[in-house]
Amino acid sequence: MSAVIENHEHDHHGPQKGILRWLFTTNHKDIGTLYLWFSFLMFLTGGAMAMGIRAELFEPGLQLMDPIRYNQLVTMHGLIMIFGAVMPAFVGLANWLIPMQIGAPDMALPRMNNLSFWLLPSAFIILLSTAFMEGGMPGFGWTFYAPLSTNYPNIAYFVFAVHIMGVSSIMGSINVIVTIMNMRAPGMTLMQMPLFVWSWLITAYLLIAVMPVLAGAVTML
């Protein structure tokens, strides 16, 4: 009887292959790799904008672009480098390292982990699509000061993109907290956790506290 049962184990249902593996993966290492590749792509995009900024500043006077386009490049460079390169890189490292450092088999909420990543490309597609709208990309600098932040319909798309990024960050933070608090190896106390895990536990709580405030602030622009 046991031989019959063994023969009916799901031999033909291995892991998905190709693009489907990356679209639907719930493995923390795969999702961490997706975060790191996305971060690298955004780093190249933001770096190209930085090169445009430096080329414009190479000599006094107008070289390559008018002041409006320059402000737009500065704004998008800042948004992409912070929200698209730095933060996803940290989250990618967290996905890779936290389960291994606390002895967990995976993140506690793997499907939420997958969704929190795929929200990010959606947000940046919306953000970069403002380049093709009336008035071009947001051009209010890193401070979001009015009246630069009150013109053109692209500001609404920027606000929507920031909301999506905030939802992604909150979902990722909840996942980190639940994983650390509930999936540590037997016998591992909080005081025995590595410093990297502690830093991410505190960061996750801070992100949950801060992201709604940021969302409210940009909504009131």
Predicted segments, located by residue:
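Membrane-embedded and interfacial regions of multi-pass energy-transducing membrane proteins
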Residues: 2-221
